[in-house]
Amino acid sequence: MLWKACRKEFNKPKYLAHSSDLIYKYRNEIAEKARFRLVDKENGDPLRVVEHIGCHYSKMFPSKGVGGAEYPYVLAGMAEAWGGNVIDYPERRHCCGYGFRQYHVKANRGYSIANTHKKFESMEPYKPDMIITNCPGCPYFLDRWQYVIAEMEGKTYGQNGFGIPVLTYEELAGLVLGYDPWDLG
């Protein structure tokens, strides 16, 4: 198919790693240098973290992802090393709603928000303090649709009425290391 489209071939490299695999590899070193841990400053309890693995992380090359395609551990491993309590929830592997066919085709946008709605309904009983992702598109859609759902249905997820914070693993690593949130972007 690639050859038909652009006369190019994809030669799978011998070594293949997602950038989140690299942070995972150094998660313990980051924990040693951490200025902050993923704990509630009021009571010292671990923060409740739900993870969202981007659809393309382990589905494209199932044997390459940390933990495999069925139960990827790359984000959970980071959150646990940094003091968090990773919460499993029924729709953990469900799409965030971004899929190119779901969002970029205007007629499919209802499907996009329905995906995200299903995911939030699934995680809500577990009262997560944050969501961590490893895809640049997922946090955008998890944030965007969370607030659209609030406007449409008057329902806000999260304990404080402001929604559940959504962070990428890079942002979370930076915060744990003590970087200023405004400098992280």
Language model regions located:
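Iron-sulfur cluster-binding electron-transfer modules in prokaryotic oxidoreductases
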Residues: 1-185
